[in-house]
Amino acid sequence: MVAYEKSPIVFLFATMMLVMFLFCGSGEARTLGYGSIKGDRIPACGYKNPNSCVKQPVNHYHRGCEKITRCARDAARYTESFNVDDDESPIINLH
């Protein structure tokens, strides 16, 4: 009599497993191709897409020093005079 009570449970379990294998096992594994991925891609920089090229920042011209800092840009302003004694080296005087 014990086997008679367990048989509906075993039958129900076997039926549920069969239904589960039919629904879950029938699906195919799908892969994504390059066509579906390529739609969201930013076009590469080149002669076909020049607008997508990122422009490099340029180095703007900047003088090394300004006239007010006296960087010897104005050579007429400075004079050189050499004082040579017998034992001394030449001395440059800037006026």
Swiss-Prot record:
GO terms for molecular function: hormone activity. PANTHER family: PROTEIN RALF-LIKE 15-RELATED (PTHR34270), PROTEIN RALF-LIKE 16-RELATED (PTHR34270:SF3). Residues 1-29 form the signal peptide. It comes from the Eukaryota. One of its GO terms (biological process) is calcium-mediated signaling. Cell signaling peptide that may regulate plant stress, growth, and development. Mediates a rapid alkalinization of extracellular space by mediating a transient increase in the cytoplasmic Ca(2+) concentration leading to a calcium-dependent signaling events through a cell surface receptor and a concomitant activation of some intracellular mitogen-activated protein kinases. This is Protein RALF-like 16. It comes from Arabidopsis thaliana.
